[in-house]
Amino acid sequence: VLRPNQQIVSAPAMKSHGGGPRFSLSLKNGYGFVHPRDRVRAHFVPQMAEMIMETNLLYTPSLVVIDGTQCWIAGGPYSGELREPNVIIAGDDRVAVDVVGASVIRSMGSELLRDFPVWSHRQIGRAVELGLGAAGPGDMEILTEDATGSADFTALMDQVRAYTEEGVPA
């Protein structure tokens, strides 16, 4: 039960998602509010990615934390090919956090996202239309902290930043 003034933390796993959504992060996490019987039905609707965004009008998380210590880059949402980006993504803007999360999945080699600029994805586009968060890279800032001093982390973040700049609608 959601109560007024309640703080909500959205804590999704980082994963690819076969079918319409292509990835499942905080915006898709809100779909958990829908009754399980109705969630199954939505998987057979061509506008699934767009419909899922409308459930996000029910609530606004105070914080989004995506566990990217591991992520699925193929298959999903229940199993798939694993990678270990070893990142945690946190923020108060679920669109911005999902754009970064999807960019990490893409950087890890996901064929589902390989040729698909994140900002042009239907799920992100609908979230922007609904005013759920950042409308483009100018509305977000990526701050990083590498606890290990890893060259792999630096290369990953460089790639993620590049991907977050692609495919921004005019």
Which role fits each region the language model picked out?
Residues V1-A170:
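Extended, low-polarity segments enriched in aliphatic/aromatic residues
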